[in-house]
């Protein structure tokens, strides 16, 4: 349910972009993301930092897109969010507070070096996505960027999450694997 809530604003953005324009879609994205936060809090009594960061970025860059009537701001938002996530993982690692281990460590037991590899892999993933977004956003037509943002980046994230899960499963202690099966 929680994952579905995360995708609703993106689906609304895509639908309204196709029906109207980038500015209508951006306004709807801001509203849908705000509603998503409220619903998430009402259901789970908690909002994750990633959701909050995304909401702030959507509101700031989406607001600038609408107010200045310039779609470059919403395009930059995607790259900046990925850079913030990558930087957050790097800083947390330096401070000795591995974020991914904190998210999954209660359900999954792995050696610290494996958590570090996963952390570094996600830093690389977010960095590559940020660069790819810059290229597509500013070298391709707006329609291509919207499709890339909605389907390309979403698909890449899904696949990378799947590969991370396979890596985690491969390195889980044998008794934990048997519990999972």
Swiss-Prot record:
Cell compartment(s), UniProt:
Cell inner membrane
Q: Which GO terms describe its cellular component?
A: plasma membrane
The record's InterPro entries line, in alphabetical order, gives:
YciB (IPR006008)
The UniProt keyword set, sorted, is: Cell inner membrane, Cell membrane, Membrane, Transmembrane, Transmembrane helix
Q: Which residues cross the membrane?
A: 22-42, 50-70, 80-100, 122-142, 148-168
* Mode of membrane association: Multi-pass membrane protein
Q: Any idea what job this protein has?
A: Plays a role in cell envelope biogenesis, maintenance of cell envelope integrity and membrane homeostasis.
Q: Give the family, as the similarity comment puts it.
A: Belongs to the YciB family.
Please identify the protein, giving its name as recorded. Inner membrane-spanning protein YciB
Please name the source species: Aliivibrio fischeri (strain ATCC 700601 / ES114) (Vibrio fischeri)
Gene it is expressed from: yciB
């Amino acid at each position: 349910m929680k994952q579905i809530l995360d995708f609703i604003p993106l689906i609304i953005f895509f639908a309204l972009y196709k029906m109207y324009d980038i500015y209508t879609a951006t306004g709807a994205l801001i509203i849908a993301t705000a509603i998503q936060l409220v619903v998430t809090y009402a259901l789970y009594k908690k909002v994750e930092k990633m959701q909050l960061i995304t909401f702030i970025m959507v509101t700031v860059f989406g607001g600038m897109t609408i107010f200045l009537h310039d779609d470059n701001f919403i395009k930059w938002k995607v790259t900046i969010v990925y850079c913030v996530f990558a930087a957050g993982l790097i800083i947390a690692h330096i401070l000795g507070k591995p974020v991914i281990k904190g998210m999954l460590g209660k359900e999954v037991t792995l050696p610290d070096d494996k958590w570090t590899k996963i952390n570094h892999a996600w830093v690389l993933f977010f960095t590559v996505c940020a660069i790819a977004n810059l290229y597509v956003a500013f070298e391709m037509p707006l329609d291509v960027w919207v499709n890339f943002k909605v389907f390309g980046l979403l698909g890449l994230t899904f696949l990378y999450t799947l590969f991370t899960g396979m890596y985690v499963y491969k390195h889980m202690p044998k008794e934990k694997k048997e519990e999972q099966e």
